[in-house]
């Protein structure tokens, strides 16, 4: 029986790298749906709108075990992957990065300083933006939803759906939407 277990473990380990998400030079996960941009959020929003998608900023950091959990267990789920690919234009920021980011109000700062400006303290943090950002607003001020931390598939799927469907406009709080989704599944 031990040789069979050893063979099974070996096959599992051999298959694991194929399932893993690439890691960039900055130590952050790089899923295929992530966009490489100049990090001018005004341009990113215009491009997202042109594609009929919502702008989503994901703030992460090297070595973040919760970021790894999202990239290894949650984002690869076929339903969640499809929600992201079909509905979101995703830009990644490094909590401690030095790449310049230009906010909607024109302020340009390194990623790490922009994260401080927005009050981002945890990774991952997902910042969901509306299709139109009022003049003079920052991304944090304009956000329709912020999700600090790692959540399971159900909550993540529900939030992606709620934002895409403009749930924040009809007065139904996300937690109420999530509870209703869970009841409908029963």
Role assignments for model-derived ranges:
Residues 1-8:
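Bacterial N-terminal signal peptides that target proteins for export
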Residues 16-20:
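Sec/Tat signal peptide C-region and signal peptidase I cleavage site
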Residues 51-65:
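Short active-site neighborhood of thiol/selenol oxidoreductases, capturing the structured segment around
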Residues 61-75:
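Conserved redox-active cysteine motifs that mediate thiol-disulfide chemistry
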Residues 77-109:
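Thiol-based oxidoreductase modules, predominantly thioredoxin-like and allied folds used
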Residues 116-170:
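Non-catalytic, surface beta->alpha helical segment in thiol-disulfide oxidoreductase systems
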């Amino acid at each position: 029986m031990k040789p069979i277990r050893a063979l099974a473990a070996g096959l599992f380990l051999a298959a694991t790298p194929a399932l893993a998400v690439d890691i960039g030079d900055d130590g952050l996960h790089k899923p295929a749906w992530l966009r490489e941009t100049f990090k001018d959020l005004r341009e990113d929003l215009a491009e997202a709108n042109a594609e009929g998608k919502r702008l989503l900023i994901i703030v992460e950091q090297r070595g973040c075990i919760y970021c790894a959990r999202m990239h290894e267990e949650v984002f690869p789920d076929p339903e969640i992957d499809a929600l992201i690919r079909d509905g979101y234009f995703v830009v990644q920021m490094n909590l401690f990065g030095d790449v310049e980011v230009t906010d909607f109000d024109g302020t340009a700062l390194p990623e790490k300083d922009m994260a401080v400006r927005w009050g981002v303290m945890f990774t991952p943090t997902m910042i969901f933006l509306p299709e139109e950002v009022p003049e003079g607003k920052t991304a944090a001020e304009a956000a329709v939803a912020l999700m600090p931390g790692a959540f399971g598939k159900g909550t993540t799927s529900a939030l992606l759906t709620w934002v895409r469907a403009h749930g924040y406009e009809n007065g139904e709080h996300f937690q109420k939407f999530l509870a209703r989704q869970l009841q409908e599944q029963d």
